[in-house]
Amino acid sequence: MVQFSIGVGVLVLSAMPLGAAAQAETLLQCSFANGKTVVLETDETGVAYRFGRPGQTPELTLHRPYDQVDVTPWPGIGRSIWEDLSLHNGEVTYRLWGALDRMSEDHELSAGLIVEQGEEELARFECLPNSVNYAVFSFSDAYEAAGYCWTHEDFTWQEACE
């Protein structure tokens, strides 16, 4: 994997294996008010993240194997059915979330991206409502398809499923 650091390490570009993009399945895609987009995809090797302006080279591309990705599944309560997925790049975490408002008539989808360094929030992007391409439970489903299962006793994912 090739990596380039720019600035203070907040922006790191890494090259994905060529074969990874060919069989990718989109988990989340949306546009933000600033004209940029985020795409989150999965393949047999892990999760890929792209952020930047459409039609241009992405500002940030990450690819992480499943054992380096954190997925928080919906706990089963609340107005929204939601989940989030976090990818780490050094000390910076890119947390993407998707939700469905189950109490509204239209069952509106929403999604977004939160960039954090430790406990500090560096940036927050809300997806434009009409741009959200997200299927409820797709983060958890992708993790399960990769061979992980959620344990309700200790609220963790494990590789050895019974």
Identify the meaning behind each predicted range.
Residues 1-9:
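Bacterial N-terminal signal peptides that target proteins for export
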Residues 22-162:
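Cysteine-centric segments in proteins
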